[in-house]
């Protein structure tokens, strides 16, 4: 039972997302339609291999602690933790891990982290999306697809060597 859909699905699962390119029956990414899951996986792998995601992460982390949203969230969490710990009556028999886990659950359930992270993203990541990240991603994708198209174009067949060129006609006198 060798149907082409099964072969295609198997090819996707073990496809060239590991970074190999060239021969071996791999699909030419330039021939895949936009939005194809295999094409997306190949592009993401290419962006990772170029270090773009690491570069974006470093760029954002270098900027995050200067933003008011981060400073505000940090202050809120500090105050929340202080208030929570002030309500605890300390004794040497306390299980510190249980106390820590209870505190962690309280912080998460308060919703302040989710809201604070959303504000940090809007102050740090969003301004960089269209002017920094998108152009770099688009350039990398275009270069990747152009390189794949170049690999996929076969070389023109060589001139046959065994044949003599046609003899010139002797009509002109």
Curated annotation (Swiss-Prot):
It is found in: Cytoplasm, Cytoskeleton, Microtubule organizing center, Centrosome; Chromosome, Centromere, Kinetochore. Signal peptide: none annotated. Residues 154-173 have a biased composition (Pro residues). One of its GO terms (biological process) is mitotic sister chromatid biorientation. Keywords: Cell cycle, Cell division, Centromere, Chromosome, Cytoplasm, Cytoskeleton, Kinetochore, Mitosis. Residues 16-25 have a biased composition (Gly residues). One of its GO terms (molecular function) is protein phosphatase 2A binding. InterPro entries: BOD1/SHG1_dom, BOD1L1. Residues 1-15 have a biased composition (Low complexity). It comes from the Eukaryota. Residues 1-32, 148-173 are annotated as: Disordered. One of its GO terms (cellular component) is Set1C/COMPASS complex. Its main location: cytoplasm. PANTHER family: BIORIENTATION OF CHROMOSOMES IN CELL DIVISION 1 LIKE 1. Component of the SET1B complex composed of the catalytic subunit SETD1B, WDR5, WDR82, RBBP5, ASH2L/ASH2, CXXC1/CFP1, HCFC1, DPY30 homotrimer and BOD1. Belongs to the BOD1 family. Required for proper chromosome biorientation through the detection or correction of syntelic attachments in mitotic spindles. This is Biorientation of chromosomes in cell division protein 1. It comes from Rattus norvegicus.
């Amino acid at each position: 039972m060798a149907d082409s859909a099964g072969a295609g699905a198997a090819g996707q699962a073990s496809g060239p997302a590991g970074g190999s390119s060239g021969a071996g029956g791999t699909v030419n990414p330039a021939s895949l339609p936009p939005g194809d899951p295999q094409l997306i996986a190949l592009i993401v792998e290419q962006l990772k291999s170029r270090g773009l995601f690491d570069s974006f992460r470093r760029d954002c982390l270098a900027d995050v602690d200067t933003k008011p949203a981060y400073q505000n969230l940090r202050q809120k969490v500090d105050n929340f933790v202080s208030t929570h710990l002030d309500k605890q009556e300390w004794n040497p028999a306390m299980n510190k891990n249980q106390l820590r886990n209870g505190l962690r659950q309280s912080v998460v359930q308060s919703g302040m982290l989710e809201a604070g992270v959303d504000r940090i993203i809007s102050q740090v990541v969003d301004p960089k999306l269209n002017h920094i990240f998108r152009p770099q991603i688009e350039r990398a994708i275009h270069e990747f697809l152009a390189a794949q198209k170049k690999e996929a174009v076969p070389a023109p067949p060589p001139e046959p060597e065994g044949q003599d060129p046609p003899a010139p006609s002797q009509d002109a006198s």
